[in-house]
């Protein structure tokens, strides 16, 4: 499978990892030792919410986000596959639910 560079912009700094196209970005982050927020791991809540600022993801497995939210860049990292090199701002649940 193809792999993409996924950059996570977190409150404690920026980390770039390599994520296979068939791996959720949250799983790849954890395998790389990054500590990102999550809860259900099923795309049904907002704990892992982030904002895509560059690139693209496939998050068809998620159910929580509305179409408009996804079009605005919101992403649930637990159900997002990278479809290009992508940059994601993490720890965004408060902004999403505000």
Swiss-Prot record:
PANTHER family in the record: FERREDOXIN, FERREDOXIN-2, CHLOROPLASTIC
Keywords assigned by UniProt, alphabetized: 2Fe-2S, Chloroplast, Electron transport, Iron, Iron-sulfur, Metal-binding, Plastid, Transport
**Role of this protein:** Ferredoxins are iron-sulfur proteins that transfer electrons in a wide variety of metabolic reactions.
- Its domain of life reads Eukaryota
Q: Which residues form the signal peptide?
A: none
Q: Pfam families recorded for this chain? A: Fer2 (PF00111)
Q: Which residues are recorded as binding [2Fe-2S] cluster?
A: 40, 45, 48, 78
Which residue range or ranges hold the 2Fe-2S ferredoxin-type domain?
Answer: 4-94
What is the protein named? Answer: Ferredoxin-2
